[in-house]
Curated annotation (Swiss-Prot):
Protein name as it appears in the record: Toll-like receptor 3
Lineage, uppermost ranks: Eukaryota, Metazoa, Chordata, Craniata, Vertebrata
Keyword GTP-binding part of the UniProt annotation: no
One of the Pfam families matching this protein, by short name: Tlr3_TMD
Keyword terms of this UniProt record: Disulfide bond, Endoplasmic reticulum, Endosome, Glycoprotein, Immunity, Inflammatory response, Innate immunity, Isopeptide bond, Leucine-rich repeat, Membrane, Phosphoprotein, Receptor, Repeat, RNA-binding, Signal, Transmembrane, Transmembrane helix, Ubl conjugation
Organism: Bos taurus (Bovine)
Protein's membrane topology: Single-pass type I membrane protein
GO cellular component, one term: endoplasmic reticulum membrane
Classification via SUPFAM superfamilies: L domain-like, Toll/Interleukin receptor TIR domain
All residue ranges annotated as the TIR domain in the record: 754-897
GO biological process terms held by the UniProt record: inflammatory response; innate immune response; response to dsRNA; signal transduction
Length: 904
């Protein structure tokens, strides 16, 4: 019999298993869509547990020293292998034999120093080979000769001193060769002979200290269209020599950024006259002097970059010959500082006259003294002009400032950061095609009369944000009815509440920004007529008073009529109230920002019409309760919610529904775990809202329906009781009338002949009442006849005998019960006694009691030996106090008179 293992052995075996699992999980690759990512896992060998059908394997940022071919045999479908940022020092030829479909091989940032003829012998399908940032100092023989399909070869950041990568023709499909950041110092004839049959398009030689371009060094590269020699310390003379060597080539793009080209002249680019150069980058060269006709040899040039230079003077012939130029970048090209205007960089009149095809001109961040009458003359196709932070003394825009742009189809004009303080009437009258005007970040301080925009017939956007102050008038924008976007952020806006509204002439307005203006007074017609408005920014103002119910005249409904509004920003306005109809017309609203206000309790139906709401921001308010009746409609289709930093009251009544909604919603809730904290009650202070336990709240949930049912039943019962109490007689009356009109009053009785319908027993003092109410009934119904002592007793007959005879000849006996009856000796001793005795002897239910007063049962029994329980309910009648019930009483009496006498 085997003995069980000791407990501590089980314990340590469990720890070992856990350590193995944790170790393996720490080195777990991510596989998705046939792509395996094994990067940053500190791997020292190739994983052997990946799916065999992967096509991409990422092994970057590990500790691999080799790529053993045997380890890749199971991954024969690989097309991309990335082994960058490892410590691989050697490539084995069999690697590509194990990966016959490999197309991209990336081995950047490794320790490879040598490449043999056999290294890539089996890599015939390779299209990209990345070997940058290794230790390759020299290419011996022909390691790339079998790479017939290679398109891109990257050998940058190595120690190569020559561009010669082979001894025989090869790489016939190569299009990109990257050799930047090496130690190449000269380009001599024959170095590119190995590419004699190639289709090389781009050659990257940047950051090489090249000092010589030997004659014919590029002639082998017949299809070369792009050459980069950035940061190569090329001098003007060496640049001129380079251009001569590029003569009669297919060069189209030439990048010479960050060199030592401080001067260019008529001869600098002379060698390029036999080319079709379209792009030239001369940025960051500390260029000071641009001689006349410097670009005369470049008639095909379309893009010229001169940014980040220090040009001193632009003459009328500086751009001569650039008849096809479409884009000119002069950003930070004229940056010389001087306290004297005469020493500032100069732009002569007609300097741009040769640029007939120019469409884009960027002159940002320069130091021009101003704009002359003919500065931009000749730019007949200019569409985009950027002059941000370009002038040192452009304080006022006059009607002559842009005279030189008259007639050009300018669409965008950027004048930001120029310290402009005033816009005169008609300043833009020459720019009839302008669509976007940016005047932000200046020092404009004036009243807008509307004449400033005269002539802007096609304007779409005016940006005036971040200026000194702007005072509006009714006519401020009457000249620009086509305006769609108006930005007036942080301009100390004045007179916003003028009437009619300054924005009323803008029926096409789509975006309006009035934020950061400390606006406190606006009227309900401010946005009237802006039916196309989609975005409204009013944050960082002081509009709290407008929505208070205590506001004189009530809350100001300034959002009414904005039927197509999509985005509304009302943050930081101090709101502590929201009118119930504030958002009534905003049915297409998609985003509301009410953050950083003082909101606590919101009206229940405030969001009922926001059926399209996708984003709701209520952060940093005083909201304690999030209930379904308020937020349910708003949360229905929500994609983003921000209610951070609110003092939530973590009770069932306040947030139970909210917590349940959080647990089931797919809405993006910003920083839910950290900034949605309970404030009250004290035991939950600082506790995350999402962790609030709602299970105690659910205990009452099953009884909610029962509670509602009980409430409804109780209300119905109370209603019925009140109805019966106040109108029961009427209901009974109409019911009895309906029934007896169909069935009649008299029930079937045994065949007996009675002379009277009823004999009425009453006290002598009640005779007037009896006569008053019995006679009308007899007149109304001739078949009905009562026996009345004063009228129907036979003359000469003893009273007692007459009473007995009358009772015998009457079908019913009516007692008119009053206090008088209880005290009447004759009634008590004879009439009542005899009537009851006859009814008992004949086994009849023939007695009807009519109570004219409220007589307790015990008094009735004491005086007449009668109780109400001795008679049928329909034979006990009470005389009504209300006159309108008399008819109902008469009807009940007729029913009682017509009822059957038999007791069985």
């Amino acid at each position: 019999m085997s003995r069980p293992l000791p407990y501590h052995i089980h314990f340590f075996s469990g720890l070992l298993t856990c350590w193995i699992l944790c170790t393996s999980s720490a080195h777990k690759c991510t596989v998705r869509h046939e792509v395996a990512d094994c990067s940053h896992l500190k791997l020292t060998q190739i994983p052997d547990d990946l799916p065999t059908n992967i096509t991409v394997l990422n092994l970057t940022h590990n500790q691999l020293r080799r790529l053993p071919p045997a380890n890749f045999t199971r991954y024969s479908q690989l097309t991309t292998l990335d082994g960058g940022f490892n410590s691989i020092s050697k490539l084995e030829p069999e690697l590509c034999q194990s990966l016959p479909w490999l197309e991209i091989l990336n081995l950047q940032h490794n320790e490879i120093s040598q490449l043999s003829d056999k290294t890539f012998i089996f890599c015939m399908n390779l299209t990209e080979l990345h070997l940058m940032s290794n230790s390759i100092q020299k290419i011996k023989n022909d390691p790339f000769k079998n790479l017939k399909n290679l398109i891109k070869l990257d050998l940058s950041h190595n120690g190569l001193s020559s561009t010669k990568l082979g001894t025989q023709l090869q790489l016939e499909n190569l299009q990109e060769l990257l050799l930047s950041n090496n130690k190449i110092s000269s380009l001599t004839p024959g170095e590119f002979d190995f590419l004699g049959n190639s289709s090389l398009k781009r050659l990257e030689l940047s950051s090489n200290q090249i000092k010589e371009f030997s004659p014919g060094c590029f002639h082998t590269l017949g299809e070369l269209s792009g050459l980069s020699l950035n940061n190569a310390k090329l001098s003007p003379s060496l640049t001129e020599k380079l251009c001569l060597e590029l003569s009669n080539t297919s060069i189209e793009n030439l990048s010479l950024s960050s060199n030592q080209l401080d001067t260019i002249s008529h001869t600098t680019f002379d060698g390029l006259k036999q080319t079709n150069l379209t792009t030239l980058d001369l940025s960051r060269n500390s260029l000071r002097v641009m001689g006349n006709d410097s670009f005369a040899w470049l008639p095909h040039l379309e893009y010229l970059s001169l940014e980040y230079n220090n040009i001193e003077h632009l003459s009328s012939r500086s751009f001569y010959g650039l008849s096809n130029l479409r884009r000119l970048d002069l950003r930070r090209s004229f940056t010389r500082q001087s306290i004297s205007l005469t020493s500032l960089p100069k732009i002569d009149d007609f300097s741009f006259q040769w640029l007939k095809c120019l469409e884009y001109l960027n002159m940002d961040d320069n130091n021009f003294p101003g704009i002359k009458r003919n500065t931009f003359t000749g730019l007949v196709r200019l569409k985009f002009l950027s002059l941000s932070n370009s002038f040192s003394s452009l304080r006022t825009l006059t009607n002559e400032t842009f005279l030189s742009l008259a007639g050009c189809p300018l669409l965008l004009l950027d004048l930001t950061k120029n310290k402009i303080s005033k816009i005169q009437s008609g300043a833009f009258s020459w720019l009839g095609h302008l669509e976007v005007l940016d005047l932000g970040l200046n020092e404009i301080g004036q009243e807008l009369t509307g004449q400033e925009w005269r002539g802007l017939d096609n304007i779409v956007e005016i940006y005036l944000s971040y200026n000194k102050y702007l005072e509006l008038t009714t006519n401020s924008f009457t000249s620009v009815p086509s305006l769609q976007r108006l930005m007036l952020r942080r301009v100390a806006l004045k007179n916003v509440d003028c009437s009619p509204s300054p924005f009323r002439p803008l029926p096409n307005l789509v975006i309006l920004d009035l934020s950061n203006n400390n606006i406190a007074n606006i009227n309900d017609e401010l946005l009237k007529g802006l039916e196309k408005l989609e975005i409204l920014d009013l944050q960082h103002n002081n509009l709290a008073r407008l929505w208070k119910h205590a506001n004189p005249g009530g809350p100001v409904q300034f959002l009414k009529g904005l039927f197509h509004l999509h985005i509304l920003n009302l943050g930081s306005n101090g709101f502590d109230e929201i009118p119930v109809e504030a958002f009534k017309d905003l049915r297409e609203l998609k985003s509301i920002d009410l953050g950083m206000n003082n909101l606590n309790i919101l009206p229940q139906s405030v969001f009922d019409n926001q059926v399209s709401l996708k984003s709701l921001s209520l952060q940093k308010n005083l909201i304690t309760s999030v209930q379904k009746t308020v937020f349910g409609p708003a949360f229905r289709n929500l994609s983003y919610l921000d209610m951070r930093f609110n003092p939530f009251d973590c009770t069932c009544e306040s947030i139970a529904w909210f917590v349940n909604w959080i647990n089931i919603t797919h809405t993006n809730i910003s920083e839910l775990s950290n900034h949605y904290l309970c404030n009250t009650p004290p035991q939950y202070h600082g506790y995350p809202v999402m962790l609030f336990d709602v299970s105690p709240c659910k205990d009452s949930a099953p009884f909610e329906l029962l509670f509602m049912i009980n409430i409804n039943i109780l209300l119905i019962f109370i209603f019925i009781v009140l109805l019966i109490h106040f109108e029961g007689w009427r209901i009974s009356f109409y019911w009895n009338v309906s029934v007896h009109r169909v069935l009649g009053f008299k029930e079937i009785d045994r065949a007996e002949q009675f002379e009277y319908a009823a004999y009425i027993i009453h006290a002598y003092k009640d005779r007037d009442w009896v006569w008053k109410h019995s006679s009308p009934m007899e007149d109304e119904d001739h078949t009905l006849r009562f026996c009345l002592e004063e009228r129907d007793f036979e003359a000469g007959v003893l009273e007692l005998e007459a009473i007995v005879n009358s009772i015998r000849r009457s079908r019913k006996i009516i007692f008119v019960v009053t206090q008088n009856l209880l005290k009447d000796p004759l009634c008590k001793r004879f009439k009542v006694h005899h009537a009851v005795q006859q009814a008992i002897e004949q086994n009849l239910d023939s007695i009807i009691l009519i109570f004219l007063e409220e007589i307790p049962d015990y008094k009735l029994n004491h005086a007449l030996c009668l109780r109400r329980g001795m008679f049928k309910s329909h034979c006990i009648l009470n005389w009504p106090v209300q006159k309108e019930r008399v008819n109902a009483f008469h009807h009940k009496l007729k029913v009682a008179l017509g009822s059957r006498n038999s007791a069985h």
